[in-house]
């Protein structure tokens, strides 16, 4: 912290973001140290942390990026603040990722350990048919197709360095405009799903 603050920070943990008991801290350090390392015993579990500064100020945190075999760019959207209300999105409620298809059993179990109930698939029909589909009765899989052009060709062009950085910027800018203008019905359906509390926790994924 800057300026340096006196006192201690205590860290408590739980696999539930809503219930983190404060009876026994897993770590204590001076606030002035600025950092600490916590090693978890079970990597298949998702842990949330409550940091208590000088037994007064409290903040919940968790890792943003989550490493799940077979799923790229899996992230927790918790902690982001709403510009309109100033409130923060709850941890462990909404995740986003790249495509989720024929993932190994260990990855399915990790999603279940996180309590995932609903998987919202935003891929087009063509994108979905190019990959094996995820079939698991424990997840409510909802398909809301949103076309974003030939994403596979774009990604391949980036990997082969055939598409320049300024071109990527223009493509993304154009894509974002098209999403807002052309897919209002699809986004309405998406937010209708998100308004139902029984669907949570939710993963939203694209290609």
Located regions from the model:
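Extracytoplasmic, non-cytosolic globular domains
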Residues: 205-207
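Cys-dependent protein tyrosine phosphatase-like superfamily
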Residues: 1-203
């Amino acid at each position: 912290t800057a300026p340096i603050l006196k006192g201690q920070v205590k860290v408590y943990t739980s696999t539930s973001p809503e219930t983190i008991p404060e009876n026994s801290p897993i770590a204590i350090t001076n606030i002035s140290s600025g950092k600490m390392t916590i090693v978890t015993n079970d990597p298949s579990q998702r842990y949330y942390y409550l940091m208590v500064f000088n037994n007064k100020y409290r903040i919940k945190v968790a890792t943003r990026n989550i490493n799940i075999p077979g799923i790229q760019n899996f992230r927790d959207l918790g902690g982001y603040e709403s510009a309109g209300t100033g409130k923060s999105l709850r941890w462990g409620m909404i995740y986003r990722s790249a495509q989720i298809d024929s993932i190994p059993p260990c990855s399915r179990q990790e999603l279940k350990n996180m309590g995932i109930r609903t998987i919202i698939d935003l891929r087009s029909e063509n994108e979905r048919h190019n990959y094996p589909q995820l079939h698991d009765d424990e997840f409510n899989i909802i398909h809301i197709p949103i076309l974003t052009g030939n994403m596979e060709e774009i990604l391949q062009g980036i990997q082969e360095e055939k598409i320049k950085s300024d071109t990527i910027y223009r493509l993304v800018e154009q894509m974002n405009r098209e999403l807002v203008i052309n897919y209002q019905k699809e986004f309405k359906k998406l937010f209708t799903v998100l308004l139902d509390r029984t669907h949570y926790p939710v993963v939203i994924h694209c290609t």
